[in-house]
Amino acid sequence: MDKCIKFDTMINHFNRYQVGLTLNNLYPTINGKCACGCNNDLPKNRKKWFSDICRQKSYINFAIVKGDNKIIRDEVFKRDKGFCCKCGVYSKYWQADHIRPVFIGGGACSLYNLQTLCIDCHKEKTKTRKN
């Protein structure tokens, strides 16, 4: 489950950058359980994360929520493997596209609203939206 859904009261989905949100706000440690939400009991030698994988995934998600463009682009490219989601062509030159436009609430918080589009498909989508 997307961690952002649990924290709707803290995250303004219309803002690209979540000012004032801290890692501890998004991932509190509760009752000796891993802060990432995996529900694993923390080993005695750990205070917040069950594993390094939990920590890394949480840091990446936090960077996405905070609007870190490099992390966002890296994760979208990794997920879509460099292929345009519309025409299927592979390119290292691509654009991250908001499926639901930012101005109607498709701004921040998760990768679910982003897709890779080749430059031609992105131009076509943008042109169609303006008409």
Located regions from the model:
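BZIP DNA-binding basic region
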Residues: 1-16, 22-60
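Short cysteine-rich loop/turn motifs with clustered Cys
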Residues: 32-41, 68-95, 118-120
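Short Cys/His-centered divalent metal-binding micro-motifs
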Residues: 55, 92-93, 114-131
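Histidine-centered nuclease catalytic patch
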Residues: 88-116
